[in-house]
């Protein structure tokens, strides 16, 4: 019985040895495979391939680009005065550019070639889009226009009731629909002419009825003279009569130097 079991043990021992050798072979083979697969990975790490470059835009160029985009989207200030799809010949002067000639004869009718400014749209008599057209006007500079064709600033610091009559320098601007030569804004020396809201009829009525109490002088803002008339009972009537005449002819006016309404 033991003799029969001895060959069986030898076979088992041999099978274990073969199994051990096969495992070693497999492990050695896997190691070679891992080595072979690891080589491309190591090569890929050493050679990452083509690199992607990124360009950095300078701050100045970025600001310039942003300002250009902002300017392209901004609405020009003159567009607030320019009607859309109106007649080109009736556009305000701020909406067009004309090739004027200052050598024309003063007071004579002249024609000039004009072009609408960018972003302005207008049409001709046939309602067709137009950019170039001709305008008719009178040959004269803007400061030679009638007073009804321009607006001037007022001064509230000069005295209107003065002898000689005072003047002041005003800044005048031509109205939008008026065409002329030269600058549309110009200085001009004007007579002092402004009002503070005082009525001549009210001052005269107070002088006749309540002049003895100085009501007319108080109304005109002359409180010192008003107190003098109040405590002297109108100068015993003489001062009252004199004030009626002075206010009636316009010699006595408001204390702030303005004109009557």
Swiss-Prot record:
Record bears the keyword Glycoprotein: yes
Record localization: Membrane
Extracellular face of the membrane: 45-193, 251-261
Record-annotated membrane-spanning stretches: 194-214, 230-250
Entry keyword set: Glycoprotein, Membrane, Signal, Transmembrane, Transmembrane helix
Cytoplasmic side: 215-229
Highest taxon in the source lineage: Eukaryota
Signal peptide annotation: 1-44
GO CC, any one term: membrane
Residue intervals of the TM2 domain: 197-244
Pfam families assigned: TM2 (PF05154)
InterPro entries: TM2, TM2D1-3-like
Glycan attachment residues as annotated in the record: 101, 136, 154, 171, 183, 193
Topology of this chain in the membrane: Multi-pass membrane protein
Family that this chain belongs to: Belongs to the TM2 family.
PANTHER family, per the entry: BETA-AMYLOID BINDING PROTEIN-RELATED, TM2 DOMAIN-CONTAINING PROTEIN 3
Name this protein carries in UniProt: TM2 domain-containing protein 3
Native species: Mus musculus (Mouse)
This protein's encoding gene: Tm2d3
